[in-house]
Swiss-Prot record:
Keywords: Isoprene biosynthesis, Lyase, Metal-binding. 4-CDP-2-C-methyl-D-erythritol 2-phosphate binds at residues 10-12, 36-37, 40-48, 58-60, 63-67, 102-108, 133-137, 144. The keyword Lyase applies. Gene3D superfamilies: 2-C-methyl-D-erythritol 2,4-cyclodiphosphate synthase. It comes from Burkholderia pseudomallei (strain 1710b). Involved in the biosynthesis of isopentenyl diphosphate (IPP) and dimethylallyl diphosphate (DMAPP), two major building blocks of isoprenoid compounds. Catalyzes the conversion of 4-diphosphocytidyl-2-C-methyl-D-erythritol 2-phosphate (CDP-ME2P) to 2-C-methyl-D-erythritol 2,4-cyclodiphosphate (ME-CPP) with a corresponding release of cytidine 5-monophosphate (CMP). GO terms for molecular function: 2-C-methyl-D-erythritol 2,4-cyclodiphosphate synthase activity; metal ion binding. This is 2-C-methyl-D-erythritol 2,4-cyclodiphosphate synthase. Homotrimer.
Length: 162
């Protein structure tokens, strides 16, 4: 069996006038994340981790932020397409672990819904998807509430040809 690990990272600036969508969940907050798509920082990090694990490049290679087709795109749809491309490359997704770093808002009440969305989009059992939320202890741009960051790791496997 051919096991592969990928890691992903994303960060977006918090700005007024946009919804805050993380893990496919709309979170009540006075600011949202700035981006070409819906700017779902968590799903972008997971997408990058999956593409990386399968050696398929990164999210920008597949869903360019200069391509008008992806303007305002639903990152859950992008994640599902990523999973399809990973499968077409011969890999099965085994698990995803992720961390969101945000000073505010509190994300703990939304984590179960995020996990459920990710598990559904990747066709994984819930116990193979983990989401953690941390603050940056008021340090740096994250601590000042200027943005939100996410990191992710993914494990994929390709069975050896018989």
């Amino acid at each position: 069996m051919d096991f592969r690990i990928g890691q992903g990272y994303d960060v977006h600036q918090l700005v007024p006038g946009r919804p805050l969508i993380i893990g496919g969940v709309t979170i009540p907050y006075e600011r949202g994340l700035l981006g070409h798509s819906d700017a779902d920082v968590l799903l972008h990090a997971i997408t990058d981790a999956l593409f990386g694990a399968a050696a398929l490049g990164d999210i920008g290679r597949h869903f360019s932020d200069t391509d008008p087709r992806f303007k305002g795109a639903d990152s859950r749809a992008l994640l599902r397409e990523c999973a399809s491309r990973v499968a077409q490359a011969g890999f099965a997704i085994r698990n995803v672990d992720s961390t969101i770093i945000a000073q505010a808002p509190k994300l703990a009440p939304h984590i179960d819904a995020m996990r459920a969305n990710i598990a559904a989009d990747l066709d994984l059992p819930l116990d193979r998807v983990n989401v953690k939320a941390k603050t940056n202890e008021k340090l740096g741009y994250l601590g000042r509430g200027e943005g939100i960051e996410a990191q992710a790791a993914a494990l994929v496997v390709r069975e050896a040809a018989a």
